[in-house]
Regions:
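Acidic/aromatic-lined carbohydrate-recognition and catalytic surfaces
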Residues: 18-84, 88-91, 96-127, 140-378
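Short acidic/polar inter-strand loop motif in beta-rich domains
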Residues: 130-135
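Residue-level detector of anion-binding/catalytic polar loops
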Residues: 4, 193-194, 358-360, 434, ...
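Residues at alpha-helix termini
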Residues: 2-4, 17, 189, 354, ...
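Alpha-amylase-like alpha-glycosidases and glucanotransferases acting on alpha-linked glucans and related
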Residues: 84, 207-342, 368-629, 633, ...
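Basic helix-extension-helix modules of the SAP/HeH family
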Residues: 1-23
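Short, solvent-exposed cationic patches
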Residues: 555-557, 563-568, 679-692
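Structured C-terminal cap/extension of enzyme domains
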Residues: 637-691
Length: 692
């Protein structure tokens, strides 16, 4: 794309026709060029023996077209299922499409129909014609994810937390896998929830400096080793005494500062952990552990190898080969890191469920990846590398957003049988009872813009949503997991209908929920198939939101286009609408609170902020939502914004803010049991018994 030419100069068909893959268009292609490209694509489709991939449900009887050389019959057409059994496809439908001459070859089209009731899974369709065999992937998904109905009938509550910010006294300056289990156990023991929603754990750069944002990873399939708890690796016992002493000293340097009221600095933490991890890796493993490691490598296949090779290549290019013994290539080290991550995440999930959590860990899936990361290179064949994903301008970010992430290329992903999408989901769901998909509307369409250009130059590009959503449902069904789609933002209502059909629950946030009859949404108007919460990680904690920090911070950073006083006044009026609804429908029950109307009240005239926060969570707990989620920052009185969209590190310390209380002091997991507010909001967040 040329510097001055935005994607909004093109239609979606134009983008498909010019195959937006990195070509440098200095000006808009002529209409003749676009039409010729479109015709070329249509010809390519008509000369394709089988579709790129077929995705259907286990209740549909789906029709599909095959193409053979004119006059040549379809000799064989059959399905090979996952279990190696075979089913011939015999039902042919009428098709009056005339043959076409494409580059001197006459092609004909025939239509066949798949039978309904096919088993769920990943299968293969094979076509044989003129002694030539062709195949494509067939994916059969559930019509509806069964776990959704389980929680609609028996609603549960959970807690959301940013793992890096939630530390214990033994942490190395950042929350880690052991802290997940510790926090989950603490929450379960206090009746605070059946799941723990945490930020994406996707891997960042293989060595410092590393990206702070968990939503801009190097890969979405593999895990960030910065979360490894060094002391929980069995092979630490094999270290020589002097090396073990060195590792202990590294840990001490960070543990002593866990209560320092400073931002989280990932680079020194990761550098120290990598030093310790290399020592443990070189200490070796016993025969049993070595076999487990090799089994893991075999199971993960080419994807793990490609990722580890990318990491090793980055290391050698920047650091040289001196970090490894000659007989221990860096590739093995990076595969080993992923194995340790996998084991420790499994232990964290086991600890959560052993404590009584029904779901346990709820993983978070970022929208995309870093443009120069592992996935951008190893999955380049299914991405559109010269595009960037973001969001158009809206009321909360009036300049729009550029997330600096290359999007899936719709057709290339289908050509790959959606296997990169499947493999990523399987890895994430292996040790999680649920998954939240950030910006789930990206499974329908994504806002593309040329890289390094303004979000105002962008346009939406559509995806095969039934394929992407159906595969989510299939992999979640196999994992026994729930799926939450973050469906906030600009969308058409039918998209929510599709998600609901597949059993993908939506997201409802108290402050964003207006009633179709005016004012704030009433309890009974909330969706059942959703995760309802008071706040999100893109808003200040509720105490800060009530004080207007979501507006004053944007004003301080130059992100507010409208008048500050007008914005604050409009926000205050809407907060009054919401709080009046909370008051009207029992949110303040049991509180020493005597106000009868929030309208006309200044922010400091509405009573104790802790009471308001507690009431908001009590209200959400009584909605019919299948899942409700309480922010850990609210349970400790924090007011600090974790992430301010549309800003860089130089403007705001996004994703580096530690957990603090209302007084601004650091809070560790060890402190939670001694905090009255933690217990108060935990109790307010309890779901009422069915029928109450």
């Amino acid at each position: 794309m040329g510097v001055d030419l935005g994607l909004n100069d093109y239609s979606v068909d134009d983008l498909a026709a010019i195959d937006f893959d990195g070509a440098d268009y200095d000006k808009r292609p002529s209409e003749e060029t676009v039409q010729a490209a479109l015709q070329r694509r249509h010809d390519q489709e008509f000369s394709r023996p089988l579709p790129r991939c077929i995705v259907t449900t286990d209740t549909e009887s789906q029709a599909f077209n095959v193409h053979v050389r004119d006059g040549k019959p379809v000799d064989q057409l059959f399905i090979t299922f996952e279990n190696s059994s075979v089913l011939e496809i015999t039902e042919q439908l009428e098709n009056w499409e005339p043959p076409r001459d494409i580059d001197g070859v006459i092609w004909g089209e025939a239509t066949f129909q798949l039978p309904a009731g096919l088993p769920q899974g990943w299968h293969t369709i094979t076509l044989v014609s003129d002694n030539i065999s062709h195949s494509c992937t067939l994916v059969v998904t559930p019509t509806h994810l069964s776990t959704t109905d389980t929680y609609i009938n028996n609603p549960v509550a959970g807690v959301m937390a940013q793992l890096y910010s939630v530390r214990s006294s033994d942490s190395w300056g950042i929350g880690d896998f052991r802290d997940i289990g510790y926090l989950g156990e603490t929450l379960a023991n206090n009746g605070a929830g059946d799941f723990l929603l945490i930020n994406p754990l996707h891997a960042a750069e293989p060595f410092p400096p590393v990206e702070d944002s968990p939503y801009l990873p190097a890969t979405r399939r593999f895990i960030n080793p910065i979360y490894i708890r060094i002391e929980d690796i069995p092979e630490i016992e094999l270290l020589a005494e002097d090396v073990r002493t060195e590792v202990t000293e590294l840990a001490r340097q960070f543990r002593e500062h866990n209560r320092d009221n400073v931002q989280i600095e990932r680079d020194p933490i990761y550098e120290a952990k990598l030093r310790a991890l290399r020592e443990i890796f070189h200490a070796g493993r016993d025969e049993t552990r070595e076999q487990l490691f090799r089994d893991y490598i075999h199971r993960e296949g080419d994807g793990l190898t490609a990722f580890a090779e990318w990491c090793a290549k980055q290391e050698i290019a920047k650091l040289g080969t001196g970090n490894h013994a000659e007989d221990e290539p860096p590739v093995d080290f990076y595969m080993w890191l992923q194995w340790i991550c996998d084991q420790q995440l499994a232990a964290a999930q086991a600890r959560c469920t052993a404590a009584g959590m029904k779901i346990g860990i709820m993983a978070d899936l970022a929208v995309g990846v870093h443009p120069f990361g592992a996935d951008a290179e190893t999955l380049a064949n299914v991405l559109a590398p010269c595009a960037s994903v973001g969001a158009p301008p809206d009321n909360y970010n009036q300049y729009g957003q550029d997330w600096s992430q290359p999007p899936w290329h719709p057709e290339r992903l289908a050509e790959a049988g959606y296997k990169p999408w499947r493999d990523m989901l399987r890895t994430i769901l292996r040790h999680a009872g649920g998954i939240r998909i950030d910006h789930v509307l990206g499974l329908f369409r994504l806002y593309w813009m040329p890289r390094n250009q303004s979000p105002q130059t962008g346009t939406y590009v559509n995806y095969d949503f039934r394929a992407l959503v159906g595969i989510v449902a299939l992999e979640a069904e196999r994992a026994g997991a729930v799926v939450i789609g973050e469906d906030l933002g600009t969308f058409e209502p039918w998209m929510q209908d599709v998600l609901n059909q597949y059993g993908i629950m939506g997201t409802s946030v108290l402050w964003f929920e207006g009633s179709p009859y005016g004012g704030a949404r009433r309890l009974e108007e909330y969706r059942k198939a959703c995760l309802a919460s008071v706040t999100t990680h893109d808003l200040p904690p509720t105490a800060g939101f009530l004080r207007g920090k979501h507006i004053t911070l944007r004003n301080e950073l130059g992100l507010l286009k409208s008048n500050l006083d007008e914005e604050l006044n409009n926000d205050l009026n809407w907060q009054a609408e919401v709080l009046n609804r909370v008051l009207e429908q029992g949110g303040f029950a049991g509180e020493d609170f005597h106000m009868d109307n929030f309208h006309g009240r200044a922010r400091d005239e509405r009573g104790d902020v802790e009471v308001l926060v507690t009431a908001a969570h009590r209200f959400v707990a009584h909605t019919p939502a299948a899942l409700t989620c309480t922010a850990l920052v609210d349970m400790v009185g924090d007011e600090n914004v974790q992430n301010q969209p549309g800003t860089a590190k130089e403007q705001y310390p996004n994703w580096c803010v530690p957990l603090r209380n209302a007084q601004g002091n650091i809070v560790l997991i060890d402190d939670l049991n001694e905090m009255p507010l933690f217990h108060k909001i935990a109790e307010a967040s309890h779901r009422p018994a069915p029928g109450n």
